[in-house]
């Protein structure tokens, strides 16, 4: 076993000394790596009893198989290490015991080597005893140092508490420490005490109050000192009085604090009751009021429960916290009525009354608007056609080839008449709605009379225009008095009839001639 350990340790040191580029090239370093891994596996085997392998098998195995063996050892080893770390975190004192065991194991290994080299076992036992005695002395020293550190920490905490109580009163100009020093100096001057030695007295008192027996002795000594101070004494006694304080003569305002480790809960309660007995009723009331104020301030400053924070979202409250609370929701929709016997009976009565009255209130369907226009009814002529079949085909082809010359239908004539009436209406509306005259629209078929161009102008020269040559009767001729039908003479009736005929002929001449409808039927 010693040879395996030595060879594995040497291989491990060799791997540490090799440079990284050497691993890339094929060399004998793979054998060193395998022996080093075997060495580490054997070292970790005692700490991992759950490992299924006693040793690392590397002969005839490739790198992946070796890594799998190491992985099977490392997984339970990590769990055991975590458990050990947790155990040490709970009990830190076990780390020292573990260190002692490690020292003993190392000493035993050294003893074995010394036995192999020829040393006596008695010498080794003496050395072990010396080491144990040194360890015990070192432990005692460490414990004393720890106790001193704890005492210093407690003193610092007491000073911090005092400073924290006075923070609300102090400011830039007023400080309580300076006030206390000033008062102590005044008291020292009154009683002839040296004020410079007060720090030494405070340290001495703290040392004397560490144990109960020492406290009693110190109280006796202080009483003697007080008696000597009033009675007078030698120079040595005056030096002792120089270290005295005001609290030594008249008693302190606050009780001395003892170690919390040495006091039980009953003793702490007794000390608090003693301190409260010395306080007046006004001071006790102030203490109670101060404690209530502190509790209320703490309640206001501490984060409130999520149920007391008003409107809150799911992201701001703990997970699944709403399952334990009865929440009130505000619904916008009207809740469904609870179905009871009264509700069902009223519904049945309502249905029966509607059936008797035949008042079913069926939903009326909305009328559908026509999506397509009505088809035009074709005009059918039952009369026999006078044209031949060839003429009919010719007329249809001519209509398809020249749609402009297609014969007008009755609907086309109606459309044309409607457009003419609308134009006349628009002309009259334009004349009524404008301050100036609106000219007539351009006539489609315009006749060009044989007249000089200057005479056709709207504003013609005086020499050319005929306005100056016309008589007033020609410019404006009155129609005369309007006569009733019974007042007309025979000549008036003839004249009126001639005017009507003249107008009718003029209108018929301007209108296009109407084509006669073809009443003939087509030949089959």
Swiss-Prot record:
Ranges annotated as spanning the membrane: none
Entries under InterPro entries matching the protein: Mpp10
Residue spans of biased composition, Basic and acidic residues class: 169-180, 271-283, 480-493, 505-517
Keywords associated with the record: Coiled coil, Nucleus, Ribonucleoprotein, Ribosome biogenesis, rRNA processing
Motif segment (Nuclear localization signal 1): 85-92
Induction: By salt stress.
Gene Ontology biological process terms in this record: rRNA processing
Compositional bias annotation for Basic residues: 196-207, 494-504
Region span, Disordered: 100-243, 259-283, 479-524
Major localisation: nucleus
Reported function: Involved in nucleolar processing of pre-18S ribosomal RNA.
Quaternary structure and interacting proteins, as annotated: Component of the ribosomal small subunit (SSU) processome. Interacts with THAL in the nucleus.
Entry protein name: M phase phosphoprotein 10
Lineage, top ranks: Eukaryota, Viridiplantae, Streptophyta, Embryophyta, Tracheophyta
């Amino acid at each position: 076993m010693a040879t395996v350990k030595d060879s594995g340790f040497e291989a491990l040191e060799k791997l540490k000394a090799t440079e990284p580029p050497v691993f890339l090239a094929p060399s004998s370093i793979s054998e060193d790596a395998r022996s080093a891994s075997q060495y580490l596996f054997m070292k970790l085997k005692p700490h991992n009893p759950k490992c299924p392998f006693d040793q690392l098998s590397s002969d005839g195995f490739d790198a992946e198989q070796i890594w799998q063996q190491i992985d099977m050892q490392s997984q339970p080893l990590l769990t055991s290490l975590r458990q050990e770390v947790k155990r040490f975190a709970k009990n830190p004192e076990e780390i020292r015991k573990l260190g002692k065991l490690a020292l003993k194991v190392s000493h035993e290994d050294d003893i074995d080597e010394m036995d192999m080299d020829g040393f006596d076992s008695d010498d080794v036992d003496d050395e072990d005893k010396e080491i144990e005695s040194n360890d015990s002395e070192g432990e005692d020293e460490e414990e004393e140092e720890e106790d001193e550190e704890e005492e210093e920490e407690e003193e610092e905490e007491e000073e911090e508490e005092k400073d924290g109580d006075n923070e609300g009163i102090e400011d830039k100009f007023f400080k309580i420490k300076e006030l206390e020093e000033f008062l102590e100096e005044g008291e020292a001057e009154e009683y002839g005490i040296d004020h410079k030695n007060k720090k030494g007295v405070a340290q001495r008192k703290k040392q004397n109050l560490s144990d109960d027996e020492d406290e009693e002795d110190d109280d006796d000594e202080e009483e003697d000192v007080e008696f000597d101070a009033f009675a007078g004494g030698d120079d040595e006694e005056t030096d002792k009085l120089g270290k005295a304080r005001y609290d030594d003569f008249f008693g302190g305002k606050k009780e001395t604090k003892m170690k919390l480790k040495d006091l039980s809960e009953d003793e702490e309660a007794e000390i608090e009751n003693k301190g409260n007995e010395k306080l007046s009723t006004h001071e006790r009331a102030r203490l109670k009021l101060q404690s209530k104020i502190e509790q209320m301030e703490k309640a206001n400053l501490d984060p409130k429960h999520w149920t007391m924070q008003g409107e809150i979202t799911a992201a701001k409250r703990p997970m699944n916290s709403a399952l334990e609370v009865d929440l009130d929701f505000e619904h916008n929709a009207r809740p469904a009525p609870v179905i009871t016997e009264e509700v069902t009976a009223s519904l049945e009565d309502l249905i029966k009354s509607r059936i008797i009255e035949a008042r079913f209130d069926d939903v009326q369907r909305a009328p559908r608007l026509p999506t397509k226009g009505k088809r035009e009814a074709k005009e059918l002529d039952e009369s026999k056609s006078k044209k031949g079949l060839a003429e009919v085909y010719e007329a249809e082809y001519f209509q398809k080839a020249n749609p402009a010359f297609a014969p007008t239908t009755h609907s086309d004539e109606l459309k044309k008449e409607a457009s003419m009436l609308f134009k006349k209406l628009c002309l009259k509306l334009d004349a009524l709605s404008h301050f100036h005259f609106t000219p007539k629209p351009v006539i489609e078929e315009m006749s060009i009379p044989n007249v000089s161009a200057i005479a056709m102008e709207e504003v013609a020269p005086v020499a050319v225009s005929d306005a100056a040559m016309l008589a007033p009767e020609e410019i404006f001729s009155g129609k005369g008095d309007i006569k009733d039908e019974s007042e007309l003479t025979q000549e008036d009736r003839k004249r009126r009839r001639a005017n009507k005929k003249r107008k009718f002929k003029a209108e018929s001449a301007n209108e296009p001639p109407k084509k006669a409808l073809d009443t003939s039927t087509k030949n089959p």
